[in-house]
Amino acid sequence: MDLVLSSQTDLTNYVKKVSIEDFGCQFLHTAHWNNRLRTTGGRFFPNDRHLDFNPKIYREFGIDIFRKIVRHELCHYHLYIQGKGYQHRDKAFKELLEKVDGLRYTPRVTAVKVNYHHYSCQSCGQVYRRRRRVNLRKFACGYCHGRLIESF
């Protein structure tokens, strides 16, 4: 049976469950999915004590790896609540992370291919590559002020 964490409520309930099972302490705040995370599995915010998680990690690696990332973020959370060193460099963090079998580093997510639009100047042949489309009636070549055409 594969666990499906589709909503913020499901995610928060899962984090609360992991906190009780692996730490013996309650998680009293909220957990959120954050699609903007690229190179990290999760983040802990000391100001309001909420956790953000990367949904790509959950989708790509499954619940086992994701649970280890949840443990990692809960190490930050519980140590901060207890007033101990909660940063990666702190001894208390390293010891607790090893004790609960959390991940020290997030596995790499396969990069999403970015599509580019290619344009070239009719006069001088200068080639431009842009992520966003360019209005060809409004913009001209930056070198010779010639007309741009879309090339493939």
Swiss-Prot record:
Cofactor(s) essential for the protein: Zn(2+)
Domain of life: Bacteria
Compartment(s) of residence: Cytoplasm
Gene Ontology terms, MF aspect: zinc ion binding
UniProt entry keywords in alphabetical sequence: Cytoplasm, Metal-binding, Zinc
Boundaries of every SprT-like domain copy: 13-148
Active site residues of this protein: E73
Cofactor note: Binds 1 zinc ion.
Designated name of the protein: Protein SprT-like
